[in-house]
Amino acid sequence: MTVGILGLGLIGGSMARAYAIAGHNVLACEKDEQMLQFAMLAGAVHGKLNKETISVCDLILLAIYPGGSADWLEENACFVRKDALVIDLCGVKREICRRCFPLAESYGFTFVGGHPMAGSQFSGFKYSRAELFRGQPMVLVPPRFDDIALLDRCKQALEPCGFGRFSVTTAEAHDQMIAFTSQMPHILSNAFIKSPTASNHKGFSAGSYKDLTRVAWLNPRMWAELFLENKDYTVSELDIYIENLRAYRDALARDDLQTLTTLLEEGKRRKEEVDG
């Protein structure tokens, strides 16, 4: 199989390594020429993905920012083979699916939204690894839910990555859930570390501090674009969180032991309910 990959950051680079190790021919498009050459020297990429080589790809993976992925596909759709499968790997789904589903239908190829639920606080090809997706969930957003053959095709095409579980959903449901499970933790972590007290944490911090601040180290431009594309759901989740924080803050300010205990009990019970 020949696989074309747009973008060689953490996700695209890890995909390239996984497919190369599995013996597939990997072509890549990367604006940073030095990074592309490094990926070739590392054996993760075997050639360039461009207008001349798009047509040889059986599978194309879009691994750059959402707007850029859709722009690239709109510009190059005429070169995509009709029997090719195109999967985007962006963190939000509504806008890219809105643009790319009709595009694929018009040109005769197949487009599926995808979101690998794996990553790192680090970005870039140098942090990529073939095992990044091993055992991790993969979310698929197909054009139709009743196309079992397409879902099987996606699973087979993504087999070299070693995903442990596949979930199928709509673009709307995906973005609503991702606002809570992914975007909110990144915002909270990034805001938390801005406390002036953080400068003196060494010697006073352990697991809880590390857990909460790990994803504060993020790619600012990428995450800003993701947040803005999903601002309705993310703002809604932020409003809920701010309201909850206010309740804790007010109970503390009033020295209200009973209310504070109740709030903590509610949070503990909710954790047990959602995670068992």
Segments the model singles out, each with a brief description of its role:
Residues K51-V80, A84-I87, G91:
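Rossmann-like NAD(P)-binding element
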Residues N200-R270:
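Interdomain hinge/lid region at the active-site interface
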Residues A130-R214:
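Internal alpha-helical scaffold of NAD(P)-dependent oxidoreductase catalytic cores
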Residues M1-K51, S55:
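NAD(P)+-binding Rossmann beta1-loop-alpha1 motif at the extreme N-terminus of oxidoreductases
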Residues H24, A44, F109, F163-G164:
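Short phosphate-binding/catalytic loops that engage adenosine nucleotides
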Residues E74-K126:
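Rossmann-like NAD(P)(H) cofactor-binding subdomain of soluble oxidoreductases
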